[in-house]
Amino acid sequence: GNSDVPVGQYTQKILAYYQLDEATLAAAGVITYGSNVKEVTTQITEGSVDAGVVYCTDAYSASLTPVDEATREMCGQVIYPAAVLKAAPNAEAAKEFLAYLQTDKAMTVFEGVGFSAV
């Protein structure tokens, strides 16, 4: 992904971890960029790229089998934050939803699609 999207930022960290020069790889046509993780997932699914960096959950959703996983050492912890907005028109419902996200039932759903608790 592009550097302005999270998956692109994680990819840059992975390349740096392996001491690979992104600019050199891009100039050589070895790497290409997607505007978001769904675009990269589609490129992999269609076979228009040899490999791509996507979230395991996106790979799972697209029936792709990851060949490797990035570690926290490579790119840090991937976190999906959630919050109730100050101006939320349905703040009480949003609070209830956030409370649900912290239940064992929700965790079972998350784990079923490849997420883990932080």
Write out the residue ranges for each language-model feature.
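Exported/periplasmic ABC-transporter solute-binding proteins
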Residues: 1-118
